[in-house]
């Protein structure tokens, strides 16, 4: 299952993404995040993390650095802590 999901994302990166202007608000891009999440946490958990990321990738979210977490938590909030470059301190 992991292989099918990763190949689907790679197909998007190769054939669809070049036809669109870059719009991802995050680094790494959502498609790279999806591949890493699926490879690191498996098909179900990786897909869940990818879906959460895609929900946040919209004009009303500031974006920024958002790496795949090393540990998985179903209850983790949708909004992670802001990167240091975006803190108001």
From Swiss-Prot:
Subcellular location per the Swiss-Prot or TrEMBL entry: Cell membrane
Protein's UniProt keywords contain Membrane: yes
Keywords for the protein's UniProt record, in alphabetical order: Cell membrane, Membrane
InterPro entries membership: Membr_insert_effic_factor_YidD (IPR002696)
Topology class, membrane: Peripheral membrane protein
Gene Ontology cellular-component terms listed: plasma membrane
NCBIfam families attached to this UniProt entry: membrane protein insertion efficiency factor YidD
Its job: Could be involved in insertion of integral membrane proteins into the membrane.
Record-given protein name: Putative membrane protein insertion efficiency factor
Organism in which the protein naturally occurs: Exiguobacterium sp. (strain ATCC BAA-1283 / AT1b)
């Amino acid at each position: 299952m992991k292989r099918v999901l990763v190949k689907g994302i790679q197909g998007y990166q190769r054939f669809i993404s070049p036809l669109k202007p870059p719009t991802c608000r995050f680094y790494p891009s959502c498609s790279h995040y999806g591949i890493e999440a699926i490879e690191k946490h498996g098909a179900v958990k990786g897909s869940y993390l990818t879906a959460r990321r895609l929900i946040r990738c919209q004009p009303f979210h500031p974006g920024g650095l958002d790496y795949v977490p090393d540990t998985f938590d179903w209850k983790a909030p949708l909004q992670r802590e802001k990167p240091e470059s975006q803190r108001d301190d």
